[in-house]
Structures are given as structure tokens and as C-alpha cells.
Amino acid sequence: METAIEQLRKLVIEGKESIPNRGVRTFTLLQELTFIENRKQVDYFLAMHRYVKELTSMPDALIGPGHRWMTASHVCHALGITNICLGSISLTPIDFWGDEDSDTTMDIEVDEDTYDWAYFKATEVFGYDNVARTSDIDNIQSEEEINTFRGYRKKQKGYSIVVCPDGVAEHYKVYEVEGDDGLDTLCIDGDVEPTDNIHIFRFNVIRSDTLTRIKRIQHEIVKAGKVCPDMYHRGSANILYYSNGYQTLFDEEDRSIPFLGDKLAKEMAEILFGKITSMEDLLTITALYSARLIYEIQVHNIEDYKKKHGVVRLFDKWRFPYGFLYREDVCWFMTGWIGMTWKESARIVQLMSGQNPLEAECLKHVYLHRGMDNGFREDELNHIWSSLFDRATKRPLPSMAHFVGSMYQYAFLAMLKKDFPEEYQSIKG
């Protein structure tokens, strides 16, 4: 009989073989599997695989392509939990490698129609007495996920599903809510502290109006007798990275695709790229836009500044640490050029916030030695290190993983807008 880790490894390898163009790396998969096994979270990933497989099998459900750290996980991609083409983006599971206490709770983004049904599907998979949901949480916000599209933070509604294999009532005070349709819901009374995802599993369900709009446009495409692209099908997902549909994102008259209709974002696109050809290009614009806007909000009244200067200029004041836009950029530089291990590189990124300066100093010595061994001058290395650790703000660099899920959805909307303009216009944002 197979052990749990053997089952997980088998599923991961089978999933990897179905991903075209070497979209996941074997080395990264093995590193992640070791991390998962050491953290005793094999059962959690197996449970998540079962649950998402059942969710995506629902005929009218639209599940997001991935959210937060999950989009950087090669294991999640191999299991079919996420649908971001990792081979086209330099995503690495920094949160896994840099911090052994990192929170691995998975977020599932769903359309509005599927939002409540996600709980009932969990009861089918794990059993009614073993599953309970928390009350709705409005205005979900994350300090690490500052999606400053048009100057405001992204706000969403969600709830948590808690799974206890030995019964939820053994661990929490619960009560039943009778539904109008005769389906009862088991709810947890009060707040739920973070779980370890070892003995008690937790999944966050997030309601997405963007996914709802995509689904309604897809319905209109089918009604018109046309072939509708499937956002969650791997073969269809890759066309986003080669389609000129990106250009339709930058339409000042269309405010229904957040952030990308903004004049500042369009200006950045025109400055940086003659033609946007990859998700990497969009992520570059997103990082520059967000950082620039944060700076202006902190230093100026953004509206007064726009009135005075016409537009918010991109490069006149903001300085990124040695040109690094994302945490992933720092990790790739540290490993590829300096010779640090992935775990050391990820830890450097986490220490940039100013915590544990003694540990940072120890890593700096290792960094200097390896950098000079690879041909860098000491003054160059010190300059790069200073740009990371001596910044005026200790706000952490953003992660691609925290932006790419939203960018993917907006790019998919742009593709629908280009290829199916009538159906797109029939569903207003």
C-alpha cells in the first residue's frame, strides 16, 4: 500500500508529464516535495488536490488560475491546482524556501455563482460532519498584496472552509444554519485561529467578480454558436503569452478591466515596450505602476500632483533597489550570478524588511565571498547589498505570485475582447 508521500509524488510526476514545454522544473518539484514532507503537510496537499478536482468538475463553476503563493508552486501546477504557465514567468516558491514557518493555506478564487456551493462541494468530498465554514469576511486585504490599481486596494469577499478528519465539533463550537433550499450549513461560532494544515486543514474561498464576468462572456460566446476558449485548460492558457490581445488592455474608454485602462499604465507601456508579448511585460508595468503610485501617495496629494504636472512621471524620483522589481528578481540574481542557494536567496529577500539584522550580516559575508569567487568586485557587491537593505522604506518588494493571478484574468478578458468583441460588450463590467 502506498504511503501518503508516495501518492503525492506519483500524482505530481503524472501531472508534470501532461504539462507541455517543460512548464515545471524537476529540481523545483523535488525541493517542494521535500519541504511539504518535512512540514508534515502531505495530507493537506492531497486533500487540496481532491477538492479542486471536484470543484473544477462542476459544469458551471469557474475557478481562478491561482492566487498568491500558489501560483509560484510547481507542485500546485503539476497537481492542476493552479493554471499559470510557469515556463513563461520566472516564478519561484520563495515563501517555501526562505521560511520554514510560512503559511501554506491555499486560496481558491471562484465566480459568484460558485461561491456558496464551494462549501457544499467540500462536504461531498470530506463528509458533512468534517467540514464547517466561517462567516463571510468583507474587504479582504493583504499588506503584501498591495494591488494599487487606480490608487485603491483590491477588496474582495471570502470565507474559510475548515476540514477536521475527526469531526469539526471535536475542535470548534459549531452551529447549523438551515438553507432555503433545504441544505444545511455547518458553521463555526467565532473566529478561527490559523491552522497548521497538519491535523486541521483550512482553505480560503474568495469571490471574484472578474471570474463572474468572464463566465458570462463565455456563455454569450457559446450561445452565438462559437468555440469558447477555456481559461482553465492548459492548452488554452498558453495562448495568452503569444497573443497580441494584450494591446486591448490599454483602452482609456474601457474602465471595466481594472488598472490597465489607466493613463499612467498606458504611458508606462508605451515607454517600456513597443509591443507587449509576454506576461513578464505586464508584470513589469504592474510593479512600476504600483511602486510609483505608492510613492506619490506618500509624498504628494496624488490629484494635486496630476493637476500640476499633467501625468505622474515614471522615472524622475523613484529608485528601485539595483533595478529589482520583484522578490523573484533578487532570488534569480543571487542564485544565478552570485552562487547562493535558493534557500539562502529566499531568506535574504525576507530579511530585507529589517528583521534579524545579525542573520542578515552573516548571510552578507557568504554573499560577498561567493560573489567575488564569481568575478564581482567587492564594491559592486556592497552597492547591490546596500540597495536592498538600506532603503528608505522597509516595505517588502512585491512578489510576482501576488500579482500574476489577477494579471492573468485581465489578459484573458483582453483576449475575449479582441476575439469576441460583440459578446464582450454585451456583458458590462
Indicate residue ranges for each PLM-predicted region.
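Mg2+-dependent phosphoryl-transfer active-site scaffold
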Residues: 1-16, 51-54, 62-66, 70-428
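Helix-rich "cap/lid" substructures immediately adjacent to catalytic or cofactor-binding pockets
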Residues: 20-65
